[in-house]
């Protein structure tokens, strides 16, 4: 969506169309937080790791624990990019799963928590896009 809003801004498009109703809920985690969680888990002592991955608990979910509607995400991206047009939702297209939220309680109880809030992560991603990817847009 960052790229789409950026293109719409620079081409002075009046609207950005997003599939679905915008009501579907999603959780987003910055890649740096995912890397941090992986290192945290890797550095656990063996006993602590085994105590938290007993049989039938072999997977450790990594997430931030909060969710946002696609509509609110789109508004946040629109503001981050500085796009002034409208956001339209094409309800003739599918929403996908109504909700996707990880249960990261086990990892949080081990002592790991995410550090980068969504708004900050979007700004970081857009700054990176401007610096390293904008030249790839036709």
Q: What spans do the regions from the language model cover?
A:
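C-terminal substrate-binding subdomain of Rossmann-fold SDR/epimerase-dehydratase oxidoreductases
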Residues: 1, 7-138
């Amino acid at each position: 969506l960052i790229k789409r809003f950026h293109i719409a801004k620079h081409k002075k498009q009046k609207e950005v169309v997003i599939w679905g109703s915008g009501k579907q809920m999603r959780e987003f985690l910055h890649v740096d937080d995912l890397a941090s969680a992986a290192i945290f888990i890797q550095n656990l002592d063996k006993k602590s790791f085994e105590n938290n991955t007993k049989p039938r608990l072999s997977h450790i979910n990594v997430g931030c624990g909060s969710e946002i509607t696609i509509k609110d995400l789109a508004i946040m991206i629109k503001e981050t990019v500085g796009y002034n047009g409208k956001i339209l939702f094409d309800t003739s297209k599918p929403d996908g799963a109504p909700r996707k939220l990880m249960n990261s309680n086990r990892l949080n109880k081990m002592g790991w928590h995410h550090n980068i809030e969504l708004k900050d992560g979007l700004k970081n991603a857009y700054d990176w896009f401007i610096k390293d990817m904008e030249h790839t847009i036709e």
